[in-house]
A protein has these predicted regions:
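Helix-loop-helix
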Residues: 1-39, 81, 181, 195-198, ...
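Intrinsic-disorder/low-complexity peptide segments enriched for small residues
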Residues: 5, 52-53, 63, 75, ...
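Juxtamembrane extramembrane loops of integral membrane proteins
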Residues: 14, 23-106
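Generic low-complexity segments that are intrinsically disordered, proline-rich and/or Lys/Arg-biased
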Residues: 35, 41, 45, 53, ...
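Short amphipathic alpha-helical "recognition" segments used for binding
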Residues: 44, 115-116, 242-245, 483, ...
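Helix N-terminus capping/helix-initiation residues
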Residues: 58-59, 229, 356
Length: 514
C-alpha cells in the first residue's frame, strides 16, 4: 500500500512540477520576429525618430499649462478628451466601483498631471518634414462641447499649409471607441503620410503580483499572444514586433485598454521603457503602409480603442462584429484555455439561470462531480482492492526486509495473481487535476465574481484582500492531492473543491459541502 502511495505521489508531484511551472509561471511565448508574409516598406519613415514627438521628453509641458476639454457620457463610460493632442486621458466606468460601497468609480485612463498618468494619443507622420502634422500640442477644434453614444463628435485640425485633418469619434453603449480620421490634401502637391498611436502609462506597477495572472503590456502578433513583463521591458529597453491583423494594449486583473489598427495593414508595434520616468512604459504602433495622397484628394483611416472591463461575452461579441483577432486571449485563461473558457461559459449560463453567481458555482461543482464520478469510482475501486491486500503486503515486507529486490518481485507476483494493477488508480487522478486547475483559474479571472453577492452576510464572493499567494496555492495543491489519495468515497471530488480550497483569506467558496 505504501508503494502505491509513493508511486501516486511521485507521479502527481512530477505532473505538478512539469505542468504547474509552465502553466502558472507562464514563460513568455516566443514569437517569430521574421515575418515573411509582410513586405518591409523602404520609405523614409522606418524608425521611431521619424515619428513626430513620439519620444519627446517634454511630453506634457504645454498641455499642463493650458487644457481645453470636451465631455462625453455613454451607458457605461464617462469622462473627457483633452483637445490638445486629442488626448484620451480621462475615462471612468459607470457600473464598476473601487469598493463595494459603490462610492468611487473605476478609473481606466488618468490625466497627465495625476500621480499615475495613463493616456492614449493618435498622430500622423509624413516623409516631408516641411508639412506640419498633428501631434501632442496640436489644438483640435470641436464642433460641440460634449457627446454621447447616440451622437458622435467631429474634431478638426488644419496645419495652415493646405492639409486638413477631420477626426470623428464614436463611442458605443459598452467599452469600444472608434476613431476615423479623414485627411484632405489641398497643399498644391502630393504628400506621403502614415498614422501612429501610442498608449503611455507612468509611475505604475501592479500592487499585487499574482503568479498565475499576467498584468501589463501585451499584444497579438502573427496570430500569437505575447505577454511582456515590466521587467523584460526594463531589461531590453525596447521590444519590437511587426505584424498585421493584430493589436496591442495594457491589461490589468479585470480591466484593459487595447488599440486595434486597421485590419490587413502591416504595422510595427513597440514596447518601450521610458527612462526619463520611474516605472513607465509606452506601447505604440506605426502603420507600415505609407500612403500617397494626391493634391485635392482625401483619404480615411479607422482605428478602435477598447477601454473597459474584461467581460468575456462582450469581448467575444466584438471579435465577431469587428473581426478583432484573438481579443479573448486578453482574459488570462492560461494554458488550459480549452477547459477554462468552456467552464466559464457553463458558469456564466448557470449563474444567469439561477440569478446568483454563488449558486452558479455550486451547481457547476455538482455537475463536475457527476461528470467525474466514473473516474472517481474507478480510482476508489482500485484503492479499495489495494487496501484488502495491505496485510499481505505487510507480511512480505517483514519477510524480505533485508532483500528489497526480492520483496518487490514477490509483491508484483501477488499483484499478477490477484489481477490488480497498483497504478490503475493513478490515471483517473491525473485526468482530474487539470480540471481542478481550470476551475480555479475561471473563478480567479471572472469579473462576475468581483463584488458579487451571495446570501445573508456574504456580499462579496471575491473576499477583499490578497486573493491568492504562492504559499497558499502550494498548500491547497497538497491538500487536494492528499484528498485524492486518501478518500474512500467518490464524494472526495466535491470535498476537495469545497472544503480544502482556501485560496483567499478564508474559504475559496463561501460554503462547504458534505
Amino acid at each position: 500500500m505504501d508503494n502505491q502511495k509513493n508511486l501516486l505521489l511521485a507521479v502527481i508531484f512530477s505532473l505538478i512540477v512539469l505542468i504547474g511551472y509552465d502553466f502558472f509561471f507562464n514563460p513568455k511565448t516566443k514569437v517569430n520576429q521574421q515575418n515573411t508574409e509582410i513586405e518591409q516598406n523602404k520609405t523614409p519613415i522606418q524608425n521611431d525618430e521619424d515619428v513626430p514627438s513620439l519620444l519627446s521628453k517634454d511630453f506634457s509641458s504645454k498641455i499642463k499649462l493650458d487644457e481645453k476639454r470636451i465631455n462625453f457620457a455613454s451607458k457605461r463610460l464617462m469622462g473627457s478628451i483633452n483637445l490638445y493632442g486629442a488626448t484620451f486621458d480621462d475615462i471612468l466606468l459607470r457600473d464598476y466601483f473601487k469598493t463595494i460601497d459603490r462610492k468611487e468609480n473605476i478609473k481606466i485612463l488618468s490625466k497627465e498631471n495625476s500621480p499615475t498618468p495613463y493616456f492614449f494619443r493618435m498622430g500622423w507622420a509624413s516623409t516631408d518634414k516641411t508639412i506640419p502634422m498633428p501631434n501632442k500640442v496640436s489644438l483640435w477644434k470641436a464642433e460641440k462641447e460634449s457627446f454621447d453614444e447616440n451622437e458622435p463628435i467631429k474634431l478638426t485640425w488644419n496645419n495652415g499649409k493646405g492639409v486638413k485633418f477631420d477626426r470623428v469619434i464614436k463611442i458605443d453603449e459598452n467599452f469600444m471607441i472608434s476613431v476615423e480620421d479623414e485627411v484632405t490634401n489641398q497643399s498644391g502637391k502630393d504628400i506621403e503620410l502614415t498614422n501612429y498611436s501610442y498608449l503611455r502609462r507612468i509611475n505604475y506597477r501592479p500592487q499585487n503580483k499574482f503568479f498565475i495572472l499576467h498584468e501589463g503590456p501585451l499584444g497579438v502578433f502573427n496570430d500569437t499572444l505575447k505577454e511582456v513583463s515590466y521587467d523584460e521591458i526594463e531589461e531590453e529597453n525596447e521590444i519590437v514586433e511587426v505584424t498585421k491583423n493584430g493589436w496591442i494594449g495594457y491589461t490589468d486583473h479585470y480591466w484593459q485598454v487595447a488599440i486595434f489598427p486597421e485590419n490587413d495593414k502591416p504595422f510595427k508595434a513597440r514596447f518601450k521603457n521610458l527612462k526619463n520616468s520611474i516605472n513607465s512604459v509606452q506601447i505604440d504602433f506605426l502603420n507600415e503602409s505609407i500612403k500617397s495622397l494626391p493634391n485635392n484628394q482625401s483619404m480615411k483611416i479607422k482605428s478602435y480603442i477598447f477601454a473597459g472591463a474584461k467581460e468575456v461575452p462582450l469581448i467575444d461579441d466584438y471579435i465577431d462584429k469587428l473581426q478583432i483577432n484573438k481579443l479573448d486571449l486578453s482574459v488570462d485563461f492560461g494554458w488550459f484555455y480549452f477547459l477554462t473558457k468552456p467552464l466559464f461559459y457553463a458558469l456564466h449560463f448557470l449563474s444567469g439561470l439561477f440569478g446568483n453567481f454563488g449558486i452558479g458555482i455550486i451547481i457547476l461543482t455538482i455537475c463536475i462531480r457527476i461528470v467525474l464520478f466514473p473516474l472517481a469510482n474507478k480510482s476508489f475501486k482500485s484503492m479499495n482492492a489495494m487496501r484488502i491486500l495491505t496485510p499481505e503486503i505487510q507480511r512480505l515486507r517483514e519477510r524480505y526486509k533485508d532483500d528489497r529486490a526480492k520483496m518487490n518481485q514477490e509483491m508484483f507476483a501477488m499483484y499478477k495473481e490477484k489481477k490488480i494493477n497498483p497504478a490503475s488508480g493513478c490515471l483517473p487522478i491525473l485526468i482530474q487535476i487539470p480540471i481542478f486547475f481550470a476551475l480555479y483559474k475561471v473563478l480567479f479571472v471572472s469579473i462576475e465574481m468581483r463584488h458579487a453577492p451571495f446570501f445573508g452576510w456574504i456580499n462579496d464572493l471575491y473576499l477583499s484582500g490578497n486573493f491568492i499567494s504562492t504559499s497558499s496555492f502550494k498548500s491547497t495543491s497538497l491538500k487536494f492531492v492528499y484528498t485524492l489519495n486518501e478518500e474512500t468515497s467518490p464524494s472526495f471530488i466535491l470535498r476537495a473543491l469545497g472544503n480544502t480550497s482556501h485560496f483567499p483569506k478564508g474559504n475559496f467558496f463561501p460554503f462547504k459541502f458534505s
